[in-house]
């Protein structure tokens, strides 16, 4: 049974803060609360929690016996991406042929003290207009500007997220910092700057920067980008599969870009 959460005491924030997916959900709660129609939380069975945020659905702690209810709920909402734990993900993949399973790796950022020399080229408070231009070049399915700007500026104002750029050509975002656990996302470089080592230098600096504050930082990578993060020395923390809706005509709804992958 899936039921919407409308009161704060109904949301198990302790559970959310125990996993990376849960922390992402908790960060959305901290940013938006329970009042916005595009950010809705639900209970799943006795102990599960589900978040629908724009075109992404996140689920933690759901039981396999909830798969029928979840598949019906997913068909009703038609999110672009669904993230949940095994074995529920595998069961949903069988029930939802309109979705494909994509392999995703979680990398832990590794600090490199030599990266401090590039800090002079890092913009700590860049123009969000400039950031969007970089992201557009890297993510053709990026949501439209107004939606992205509204969400990003809101999360930055509330201290949930922080955006950086490097040499006006590469960008990355701290998606959340919860209990010293940091998720980095929205990593992109302008086409004309690719191959110059900007992303490599910038991410090594970001790893070093966060380590100064005793933060454990990770980022997600689908297989198409996985080799790059191995090459720069980031460590595989875990791997999983996520569900994504197969190709359709509604490109604007594709990819909330909540993690850049």
Give short role names for the model-derived ranges.
Residues 53-54, 143-188:
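A conserved beta-strand-loop-helix scaffold within acyl/acetyltransferase catalytic domains
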Residues 65-73, 189, 195-210, 231:
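Conserved acetyl-CoA-binding loop-helix of GNAT-fold acetyltransferases
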Residues 99-110, 235-254, 258:
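Conserved catalytic-core motifs of GNAT/GCN5-like acyltransferases
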Residues 84-86, 100-114, 125-128, 133-142, ...:
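Non-catalytic substrate-recognition and accessory regions of acyl/acetyltransferase enzymes
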Residues 87-100, 200, 223-240:
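Conserved active-site alpha-helix within GNAT-family acetyltransferase domains
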Residues 1-94, 140-147, 164, 258-261:
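N-terminal charged segments
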Residues 76-86, 210-222:
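Conserved GNAT acetyl-CoA-binding A-motif
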Residues 1-13, 118-133:
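A short beta-loop-alpha structural element at the N-terminal edge
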């Amino acid at each position: 049974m899936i039921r919407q959460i409308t009161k704060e005491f109904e949301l198990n924030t302790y559970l959310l803060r125990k996993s990376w997916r849960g922390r992402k959900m908790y960060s959305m709660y901290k940013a938006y609360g329970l009042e916005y129609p595009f950010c809705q939380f639900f209970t799943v069975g006795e102990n599960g929690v589900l978040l629908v945020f724009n075109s992404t659905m996140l689920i933690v702690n759901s039981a396999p016996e909830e798969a029928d209810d979840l598949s019906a709920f997913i068909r009703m909402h038609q999110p672009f991406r669904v993230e949940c734990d095994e074995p529920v993900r595998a069961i949903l993949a069988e029930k939802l042929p309109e979705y494909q399973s994509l392999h995703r790796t979680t990398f832990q950022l590794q600090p490199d003290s030599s990266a401090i020399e590039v800090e002079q080229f890092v913009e700590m408070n860049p123009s969000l207009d400039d950031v969007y231009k970089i992201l557009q070049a890297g993510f053709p399915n990026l949501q439209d500007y107004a939606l992205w700007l509204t969400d990003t500026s809101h999360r930055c104002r509330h201290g949930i997220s922080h955006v950086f750029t490097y040499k006006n050509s590469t960008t990355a975002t701290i998606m959340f910092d919860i209990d010293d656990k940091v998720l980095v996302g929205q990593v992109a470089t302008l086409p004309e700057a690719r191959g110059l080592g900007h992303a490599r230098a910038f991410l090594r600096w970001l790893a070093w920067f966060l380590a100064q504050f005793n933060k454990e930082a990770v980022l997600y990578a689908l297989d198409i980008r996985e080799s790059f993060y191995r090459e720069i020395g980031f460590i595989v923390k875990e791997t999983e599969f996520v569900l994504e809706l197969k190709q359709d005509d509604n490109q604007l709804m594709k990819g909330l870009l909540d993690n850049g992958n």
